[in-house]
Amino acid sequence: MTRALVIVLDSVGIGGAPDGAAYGDGGADTLGHIAEACAEGRGDRPGLRAGPLRLPHLAGLGLGLAAREASGRMPPGLAPDGPVAGAWGHAVETARGKDTVSGHWEIAGAPVDFDWGRFPATRPSFPPDLTRALIEEGNLPGILGDCHASGTAVIEAYGAEHLRSGKPICYTSVDSVFQIAAHEEAFGLERLYALCGIARRLCDPYRIGRVIARPFAGSAGTGFVRTANRRDFATPPPGDTLLDRLAAAGRPLVSVGKIGDIFAHRHTGTEVKPAGNDACLDAALAAFADLGPGGLVFANLVDFDTEYGHRRDVPGYAAALERFDARLPEIRAALRPGDLCLVTADHGNDPTWTGTDHTREQVPVLAFGPGQRPGPIGRREGLADIGATVAAHLGLALPAGRSWL
């Protein structure tokens, strides 16, 4: 029986969103702008990388071709050197947003057809009733932040005061999120998780997609750093997803990285959550080696987004792309006859763009495996086509999306 491996390169958009201007993202192009920056020497960092962006294996699967169709231009150095080895195309998100949850749910066949709630870019940002309830139920002396902020900047700004006062740092962004940062030792990791559970319930009436625990360590003297113990508290998907259909059919499923959090741990199978892209890919390949017939390994590689996109770090993002590309032969070697591997993204996060938020972009769709027919699959009018294709490959059906098989 067939098997499938889906790898989401978190935030690796390819530009060309037809409605990008409505989000302030007209012209945003994560992959294209990274490639251009590297070609111009702006992607160099001593000891990390230098020169043009080199992604020969992804280019050979049609990544550059997909980017050209989406954005209208070929990213420098990403033209394939010979026949393309997989099916390639690009997809337009139908959900009205550019957040992780919407992107992943749509990939899994449950497009978001409503508007998420968001907090305004004011100070304070949160409704007073929400703040009062969180302080009371969480037994807190108060909160810090209460604003739109970058995750790294906010702990630099409030970390020392947090340690002195015991007040957690609460902040948001243009996405539908309520984030709580607290020191792992001084505040306590389990206490932070419990507080986020309270916040999850309190945020439900506001239709907030995720409450995110953002633990950090360090001191004012040595500096503060976020740890790997992030946890997302998402609201459940609004309808059946590919994961639900797999569970109903009794199929094996392994969720790697933050997939479990994104789907509110509903029918997410065996969850594995290592830290870092390489560790997540190691876990995905190990799980796939043992995966039974008709099963799925669903992996998210988040470092592209959290470590490099939000931080607007072009050299770091480029190096991470090159590292993933170098492991593609390993991924292809893991595929048996009847297996399908699909590489895609959930949104963009252009590190050359203004601000620190996600960018509205199309995403690449690259599908390959023994016996898979190579060639263009065109523009997909919704990320749900990805889930529909995986479902069809596994002999299942989804209510949304159209398979290209």
From Swiss-Prot:
Documented EC number(s): 5.4.2.7
GO molecular function: magnesium ion binding; manganese ion binding; phosphopentomutase activity
Keyword Isomerase recorded: yes
Compartments where located: Cytoplasm
GO cellular component: cytosol
Alphabetical list of SUPFAM superfamilies matching this protein: Alkaline phosphatase-like, DeoB insert domain-like
Cofactor(s) listed in the protein's UniProt record: Mn(2+)
Keywords per UniProt: Cytoplasm, Isomerase, Manganese, Metal-binding
Similarity remark: Belongs to the phosphopentomutase family.
Function description: Isomerase that catalyzes the conversion of deoxy-ribose 1-phosphate (dRib-1-P) and ribose 1-phosphate (Rib-1-P) to deoxy-ribose 5-phosphate (dRib-5-P) and ribose 5-phosphate (Rib-5-P), respectively.
Name of the protein: Phosphopentomutase
Originating species: Methylobacterium sp. (strain 4-46)
Species lineage: Bacteria, Pseudomonadati, Pseudomonadota, Alphaproteobacteria, Hyphomicrobiales
